[in-house]
């Protein structure tokens, strides 16, 4: 896993107060969670968008939204995936959730819910976005699939600076 290798090997170049995104004590759990995260959520949109049959679409659709329900439940009592400590898993998940909410959901047909309709996931996204490093590197401009060459910006989707507490 390239990201884990970089997190470990380049740790010495990070600021002293930067969180360790792949701490030794959580590595097994992070790896297990990421092994679940990729096929069910990170790749969920692509499984729906590029399927070759209605059967495959329906299976990917149900799996993606069932997985979001599980994730929303997990975040009911946790600020981050592993409690109060931010990890590699949070970074991987955040990127997908922001992309889904600002763009991807438009490409897969009718959807059960938007990210904004999962209260714990939505609070989690807003909480992460309120952290300076996430805000600095979250870019809301993307090419829309229905208007080639035209870019739209949607920072207001997540930029609400309402404090989020667990």
Language model features with spans:
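C-terminal alpha-helical interaction module
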Residues: 1-166
């Amino acid at each position: 896993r390239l990201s884990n290798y970089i997190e470990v090997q380049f740790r010495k170049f990070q600021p002293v107060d930067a969180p360790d995104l792949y701490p030794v004590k959580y590595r097994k759990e992070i790896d297990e969670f990421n092994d679940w995260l990729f096929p069910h959520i990170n790749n969920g949109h692509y499984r729906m968008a590029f399927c070759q049959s209605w059967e495959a679409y329906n299976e990917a659709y149900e799996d993606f939204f069932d997985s979001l329900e599980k994730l929303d439940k997990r975040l009911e009592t946790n600020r981050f995936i592993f409690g109060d400590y931010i990890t590699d898993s949070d970074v991987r998940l955040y990127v997908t959730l922001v992309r889904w909410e600002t763009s991807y959901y438009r490409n897969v047909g009718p959807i059960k819910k938007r990210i904004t309709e999962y209260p714990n996931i939505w609070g989690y996204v807003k909480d992460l976005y309120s952290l300076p490093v996430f805000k600095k590197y979250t870019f809301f401009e993307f090419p829309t699939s229905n208007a080639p060459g035209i870019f739209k910006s949607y920072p207001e989707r997540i930029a609400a600076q309402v404090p989020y507490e667990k």
